[in-house]
Design a protein with these regions (language model features):
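Edge beta-strand at a domain terminus
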Residues: 142-172
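Tryptophan-anchored aromatic micro-motifs
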Residues: 31-56, 85, 141-145
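Internal, hydrophobic beta-strand segments that form the core of beta-sheet-rich folds
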Residues: 124-150
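C-terminal region of N-terminal signal peptides and the immediate post-cleavage residues
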Residues: 3, 7-10, 19-38
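One face of beta-strands
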Residues: 37-41, 62-68, 109, 139-145, ...
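A short, structured loop/turn motif at beta-sheet edges
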Residues: 30-36, 69-76, 98-104, 131-141, ...
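Flexible, membrane-facing loop/turn or short amphipathic-helix motifs
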Residues: 46-56, 114-121, 148-158
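Predominantly extracellular/secreted and cell-surface proteins with exposed
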Residues: 56-128
Length: 172
């Protein structure tokens, strides 16, 4: 094969790959980078797994409605929870934001984990959490809330499924 043919074949292959990537669903992910309006968030604590003893402690699923507003004005798309509920302890951050990474909404935070001990005591263990939610059909986002509890009685990991479902407006 001549040198010109090889160059043409490589160029054609690169162009085809570029078109395939450009037309792939991931290329349309930018369209999914808006997370606005009211959503029902479900943290499936009753389905949690992990290496921490906290993963084996029984809990119920936690559900709450939140309203989100997205902005891409800084070149990075961010969605913010409007008027978030009060933090359950003083160690939790008040502002809640997720950043769009091209395929998922991601939130990372340093926090403390409320580790229940015998006798009704609670130990506040240092932890790092990351939540990653992927847009799916009908505007539903699904993902995992992953926490690494760095030290203390609950040291280890906890993973729980999380979902965000759009709240439909009432039908009149």
């Amino acid at each position: 094969m001549s040198g010109h043919r090889k160059i043409a074949l490589v160029a054609l292959g690169a162009a085809s790959l570029g078109c395939a990537v450009w037309l792939s669903p991931a290329a349309f992910a930018g369209q999914a980078s808006s997370w606005d309006g009211p959503y029902l968030l479900t943290f499936a604590a009753n389905q949690k797994t992990g290496t921490s003893m906290a993963a084996r402690q029984p809990e119920t699923a936690q559900r709450a409605s939140y309203s989100f507003t997205s902005s891409c004005s800084t070149g990075v798309c961010v969605t913010t929870v409007n008027d978030p509920p009060a933090a359950k302890n003083q160690y939790m951050q008040r502002s809640v934001q997720y950043a769009w990474n091209g395929s998922q909404w991601v939130q990372q935070m340093n926090r403390t984990w409320d580790c229940p001990l015998l006798g009704g005591l609670v130990e506040h263990d240092p932890a790092r959490s990351i939540t990653a939610l992927t847009p799916g059909p009908n505007g539903v986002l699904t993902g995992v809330f992953h926490t690494e509890i760095v030290s203390g009685a609950c040291k280890g990991t906890v993973d729980m499924p999380v979902s965000a479902t759009p709240v439909s407006p009432p039908i009149i």
